[in-house]
Amino acid sequence: MILGLDPGRDKCGLAVMKQTKQIVARLIVDSNQTISTIQRLCQEYNIDLIVMGNGTTSKDWYYKIKSNLTSEISVVTINESNSTLEARDRYWLMHPPQGFQRIVPQGFRIPPCPVDDIVAILLIERYLRSFN
């Protein structure tokens, strides 16, 4: 299983995905709860790889994760350029707009909730695509 992490200062997006690209969990947590949540997810889903974005806080998060998890879990960083914009588009695929929102062009729609968990999914997908 692979855990995706979109690290941030205030909140972090997390997703757990099978190698078959089936999403088994996705959530957004406060940054101060991220390490304990990752530890729980690693035990619950037998995570062997963490894929995280390479944004501004990634170095700090990398060291936090490595110092709080067993060495058997690999941690890799991946380019997260444009991942938030891509996650907004993915949000509308996962939750098609209703009512008035249907006539608003997709580029003008803003999801009604954070998309950090979807970014975490996209980071895993980017990682898996890098092998094809």
Task: Annotate each language-model stretch with its function.
Residues 1-5, 9-132:
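Phosphate- and other anionic-substrate recognition elements at nucleic-acid/protein interfaces
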